[in-house]
Amino acid sequence: MLHVSASKNMTEYFKSILNDVNNLYFIAEECRKLGYDVVDKVEIPLAKDMADRVEGIVGPPKVSERIRELVMELGKEPAALEIAKEIVEGRFGEFGKEEGAEQAVRTALAVITEGIVAAPLEGIAHVKIKKNHDGTEYLAIYFAGPIRSAGGTAQALAVLVGDYVRKNMNLDKFKPTDDEVERYGEEIDLYQSEVTTFQYQPKIEEIRTAVRNISVEITGEATDDVEVSGHRDLERVETNQIRGGALLALVEGVLLKAPKILRHVDKLEIEGWNWLKELKNKKEEINEDIKDEKEDFNYEEEEDLSQYDDCEIEEVTKFIGEVIAGRPVFAHPSKKGGFRLRYGRSRNTGFATDGFHPAIMYLVDDFMAVGTQLKTERPGKATCVVPVDSIDPPIVKLNNHSVLKIDTVEKAIKYRKDVLEILFLGDILVNYGDFLENNHVMLPSSWCVEWYEKILKVNNIPYSTEFISNPSPKEAVKFAITTKTPLHPVYTYHWHDISKENIYSLRNWILRGNFNKNSDKWEISYDLENPEDISNKRFLELIGCCHEVVDGKIFILEYYPLLYSLGYDYENSFDSVENLEEKVSNAKNNMHLINLLSHFEIRRNTYIYVGARMGRPEKAASRKMKPPVNGLFPIGNAGALVRLINKAVEGGKTDEIEISNVMCSCGKVSLYKKCPFCGKSVIPTGPTRIKLPIKDYWYNALENLKINKPGDVKCIKGMTSKDKIIEPLEKAILRAVNDVYVFKDGTTRFDCTDVPVTHFKPCEINVSVNRLKELGYLRDINGNSLENDKQVLELKVQDVIVPESCMDYFLNVSKFIDDLLEKYYKKNRYYNSSNKEDLVGHLIIGMAPHTSAGMVGRIVGYSKANVGYAHPYFHASKRRNCDGDEDAFFLLLDAFLNFSKKFLPDKRGGQMDAPLVLTTILDPKEVDGEVHNMDSMWEYPLEFYEKSLEMVTPKEIKKLMETVEDRLGKDEQYEGIGYTHETLKIDEGPLICSYKTLGSMMDKTSAQLAVAKKIRATDERDVAEKVIQSHFVPDLIGNLRAFSRQGVRCKCGAKYRRIPLKGVCRKCGSRLILTVSKGAVEKYMNVSQTMAEKYNVSDYIKQRLEIIRSGIDSLFTNDKRKQVKIEDFFK
């Protein structure tokens, strides 16, 4: 019986997945029982829900059933507090005081974070009971760096849980000394100057208030090699170094999330947190939290804006504060011609991913590929690029000065080399859910066909579908006049981008022209030497009116709506505007004037232009350690720098290695639980240092596998795990034979950028209709039987569409697994795959690097895009959104057979990115809550567009919208999710970002600035300055500092912080090598100075570069004086 509400179809789907999981689990268990592996059973426990995950990751045993009861009764956060209370009361076994407190905090935090992220394990180092100076006892929580993975809210709630545990243990409050209070302020300043910045920059008084009032001590381990200089050697602070985890919990937890903590405190009636209200009020007064406060947006006119009024919204410049070399700026903040805000969701957008017209992806020189991350101005901090061809395309000016709307990919490819200027970048499609998630005020909607259609529907005005999507110029004008409705959006120009005086000038200039019957276009004489012609031609470009320039004449094809918009009755050859100068004078603004002139209502085309710059390029690549290795079998320095075990054997080399081992009764050293030479079960102990019998193990493994010449096999130098237990060498050999690589935990992974998709076409995923029917896809979104590969199907929530390169890699991995089953475990092959299509239907694990829980998925197909397509629920189950991050896929049977906790590094964060537990069935209620805000409608109502003009908060109009949250707990939570905008192909557009294909940094920056030069919404000089200031200068200074502080290394692998007195390696006597070279220090110097001169950056930046150049020269140039004779001065 499933624990989730689902239709009969979805229930069968989940049962199929469970059956496959259990089958693979059985196969792996049978293999593990043979005793060849580190542990004799599969080490990944299966979890059906959050409660199972919590018990599997942090415990205590038998807590899962109680968690289910409490969550059902109280809700997640109250349940977390109650379970913490019951743990310290001894309901789940007797613990010591400190042990019980630590278990309570970890378990409660695991409940809050859905049992997915690694923070409860790795983010809390330990919990101690310490003493105040008055002798009373208090609770101290030691946070570590991985607490970041929990997110700010969970970090704050961890502190709240600590306080709740403290009260139930009858402990006193933490009473800090003045020095301890000031220590936090010093650390926070030092962290931001030496390590990285926080999302929120607190005032010193806020820090003092928080530290003095929080009832538990927020402390932690040293995370960075930076020491405080003022408040050192404090009795209750064990380190003088920065405690990064503690600072994160304090700043990005308690201080940043104060409003959320208050809601929980009030709801749960927890005492001692009223001081947060005063803190919250102060923050609101100074508008610190730009994300949550509506006051950040200033309006020029009255608040209740109409669609005709000007709307001045404060630009957000944070996204452009740092510009990376080689990654273009596509639009400066709110700059005219930037991305036009369009509301809606396509089948491949939502959950922080926005849609862009595929044409613009080509026009910006392929810097926007499918999956490329953009840092955006609003509503969130970042997004992922995906194509949506049903939104407004870019408008460009060609080298011959013609202006053209590039509405197809074919046109974009044809004209891309002829583009002189990109006048308008086109739409950015953002769904309502992203505004709701970011608590960003709704911004006025652009005038679009879906809004226009709603007006016609509400007024019962008949129309055709063809008219809505593609009206002729005459149809649009006549329809507007006869029905007294606004002009169709297709012919509504950007009149607001020029002044009313410009409109007056443009009108007079256009009416000097005449109709050319031969070309069926409006013709205007154009003299390149005439300033009036030049300025009015520019006005024509700025309103987005397409035209051709041929032999000194301008030809306008869409003249009909243009003339009527300007008040000229073309049919009667009559200028209907009287007292033109008076109208211009009396008009409040440009939109007022154009409506006074026209024969119909003209809506404002665009209110908001959104700025954006490139973030990370898309990614689809196999996961490899550095350097890449085939197995977790250590050989020390025997394999030299290339770490090839076969070369070590050929050269007769070995090395001393610290490793678990035992002397078997057969007289051989066994590194495994079962002696590979006699087959006897043994118990390795250690770790101890031994001379590794590499040759014996190599030939034994080859004989066992019946392989003669496996080729090169790369191994590790040593294990970083606690017990130094190793993986069988046979696995490394088989991986090498099949050209696959291993990760730290024994699995073989493929990383790719997360992109959402809720619906797909069979032709997009390279799978036949018949195969899809076998996988349970029987009907399309309209209820019709699946017959052809162009029908749109709704993606099942645990199905994934992987990159083609991932399928190629997994094909190799499947062959490795089959070889492993057959040649090592002596079992039947499982996959038997000969091509990519054979892997469709097989199970994988999806996992994010900041988590410790995997999610079962099923391969349903593959695309050419270098991204991992999956349902938004699937990404949310990994605690991810889709703003450009990357996660991993790996075959489920590979994980069951090869994963072991014994391989994980014995260091802080070592258990992150490891499948310590596996969720088998996706429950939408237990995934990251951000996806609950995603809208699931097939269309937005008219009231939505009208309310957007009032700039209401998203919550004020939530009753108008349907989101995923409204479906939770019902059968509809899995099926019937809608989208508003169609797209032809989800992978249409460039597949590889230019950033990845360009070679040198000079090439990258040249291409970056070439893009900036041709975009109207971008200032190339400002881009050049920002690249130098935010990227090159810090790198140059940092590299100079690194050179002066560097250590040295030897080819044998030895490293020294300082050069030994002998001047050579103490281990082998070889010459020592610098770890930072001269080239690394000055690599950006020439490109920086070239850019500075070419783009005439400020004198300040030029002088900074000169000073850095001087520093580099003084470091590397020999200034030693030469002895000269006096006669040398007279030559």
Curated annotation (Swiss-Prot):
Molecular-function annotations in GO: DNA binding; DNA-directed DNA polymerase activity; single-stranded DNA 3'-5' DNA exonuclease activity
Keyword Hydrolase set for record: yes
Database matches in Pfam families: PolC_DP2_cat, PolC_DP2_central, PolC_DP2_N
E.C. number: 2.7.7.7, 3.1.11.1
Highest taxon above the source species: Archaea
Catalytic reaction equation(s): DNA(n) + a 2'-deoxyribonucleoside 5'-triphosphate = DNA(n+1) + diphosphate; Exonucleolytic cleavage in the 3'- to 5'-direction to yield nucleoside 5'-phosphates
Keyword Nuclease: yes
Transmembrane segments: none
GO biological process annotation, one example: DNA catabolic process
Keyword line: DNA replication, DNA-binding, DNA-directed DNA polymerase, Exonuclease, Hydrolase, Multifunctional enzyme, Nuclease, Nucleotidyltransferase, Transferase
Annotated function: Possesses two activities: a DNA synthesis (polymerase) and an exonucleolytic activity that degrades single-stranded DNA in the 3'- to 5'-direction. Has a template-primer preference which is characteristic of a replicative DNA polymerase.
Self-association state and partner proteins as the record states: Heterodimer of a large subunit and a small subunit.
Family named by the database record: Belongs to the archaeal DNA polymerase II family.
Protein name, UniProt field: DNA polymerase II large subunit
Species assigned in the record: Methanococcus vannielii (strain ATCC 35089 / DSM 1224 / JCM 13029 / OCM 148 / SB)
Name of the gene this protein is made from: polC
